[in-house]
UniProtKB/Swiss-Prot annotation:
Domain of life: Archaea
UniProt-listed SUPFAM superfamilies: Preprotein translocase SecE subunit (SSF103456)
Subcellular location: Cell membrane
TM segment ranges: 35-55
Residues in the signal sequence: none
GO biological process: intracellular protein transmembrane transport; protein secretion; protein targeting
The protein's name: Protein translocase subunit SecE
Homology family: Belongs to the SecE/SEC61-gamma family.
A cellular-component GO term for this protein: plasma membrane
Subunit structure: Component of the Sec protein translocase complex. Heterotrimer consisting of SecY (alpha), SecG (beta) and SecE (gamma) subunits. The heterotrimers can form oligomers, although 1 heterotrimer is thought to be able to translocate proteins. Interacts with the ribosome. May interact with SecDF, and other proteins may be involved.
Protein's organism: Methanobrevibacter smithii (strain ATCC 35061 / DSM 861 / OCM 144 / PS)
Membrane topology of the entry: Single-pass membrane protein
Example GO molecular function: protein transmembrane transporter activity
Function: Essential subunit of the Sec protein translocation channel SecYEG. Clamps together the 2 halves of SecY. May contact the channel plug during translocation.
Length: 59
């Protein structure tokens, strides 16, 4: 498979994905945003707890 064939296949695959995908509606977008915000908050809390424990034991 040469470079041109690989490029054409990649473009064809990208077009197929874009054809079947759709824009999320407002409800889906809000739900996804809430889930992402909760995940970021959890990671932040875990990081804060790790730093707090490190400070308490003197690292």
């Amino acid at each position: 498979m040469n470079v041109q064939e690989r490029f054409d296949k990649t473009i064809k695959d990208c077009k197929r994905v874009l054809k079947v995908s759709r824009k999320p509606d407002k409800q889906e977008y809000l739900e996804f945003s809430k889930i992402v915000a909760i995940g970021i908050a959890i990671i932040g809390v875990v990081g804060f707890i790790i730093v707090l424990i490190g400070e308490l034991i003197g690292l």
